[in-house]
């Protein structure tokens, strides 16, 4: 039959297949028709779709699924009973090379900077050869590179390695070949190298990553499970303060002033920025686990990251965040995101 494209306001009829009343894979369920069986309103859809039943699994099927689940759980890495609380090392993510001076602040162990043409050019204005800064600077590869950019960043990585920078943070599998042929390089995984379970962590370890970063969307329970297996996995860093990236895309947002706040119907605010040909949408409130550092320490977290790339490490806001970090005090107008409420 000839089908039409469904548009907003069109009426849609649901056809229940003649297969015992249940939907099966491959069934053509929705089609446009002239009869107003129901509108696309949530209430009408719910009333109609509630009539669709899911077949009950047989006892044999339930037993097979239960056995598969038990076998999968039994094959996981063993968890330690109670992780030993250790001192936490802090890495600060800055906005520009001048932010490297945050390394002079007490309690700051490392400094991280996104590798861009601007930060590479600004490196000339900083005495990065200081003996007390050696080995403490991490360069992060941007998550999205296109076309000839990959080769340009490959050359930049080689140049930085030649200047004594040995630590780099990756954000996807495509970054690994950049470091082919380079010696004495330490590769770290960013939060986009998703590590939501121990099997993922082991896979990244096999690929050569010596440190991993927990996903910004992770929750307390899952982080605890990962940290309980720390003896068998690469060290896991947890970001305790960061802008919350909602979207990163090449699609431009027209007619919006960079940095302005857009308000959704539910009241949520989003800030839009245009950088290096990419559109970055950030949540109005930053993610913050400040106030939970003692708990993370008891869970076995030994590496924490404070991302000040939006405001700058030496700005008034940056100093406020670092002071709150030192005191383990929560900051207003921030959100713990999924940490307390759990993964949806």
Residue ranges and their predicted role:
Residues 1-344:
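Active-site pocket-lining/capping segments in soluble small-molecule metabolic enzymes
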